[in-house]
Amino acid sequence: MLYDANYDRELVEERQMCKDICHEYNMVKPSDLERRREILRKLLGKTGKEFLIEQPFYCDYGYNIEIGENFYSNVNCVILDGAKVKFGNNVFVAPNCGFYTAGHPLDVKQRTAGLEYAKPITIGNNVWIGAQVCVMPGVTIGDNCVIGGGSVVTKDIPANSLAYGNPCRVIREI
């Protein structure tokens, strides 16, 4: 389903509010872990009790993001959460990773009109995502996976897989 993310007043206001909260979060002293968690608990749709997202962190709405217990994200995590983005328990995200639910139509008239779509992303339990990985709209990564650095994940990855590449593909079972 296509929607107008660029000119829909409500969505623009929600993204602006989220940007302000992300800015506030990114300006908190790194050593003030409790304040950082407090801000993220207000911003994100659901969090586990124990989690840490290193600064800087950016997202579009925040309320579409769910993180499980013992979630850790290193610096420069970007989550474009036009749809639900769910991370399981014990997920480790290395630096400079992006999770992109948003996509744009191939039709030039629709695209230039500002229309886009969003598809959910699901990351299972016990997953390690290497540095500079891009996870694209609609992808599910199963439990116990390792995604190698620099990968572009365009299709689902089954549980218990080592996968890497551009496009990302399963290398072997682990």
Model feature map: region roles:
Residues 128, 146, 162-164:
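Short-chain dehydrogenase/reductase
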Residues 1-50, 168-171:
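Terminal amphipathic alpha-helical/low-complexity segments used for targeting or macromolecular assembly
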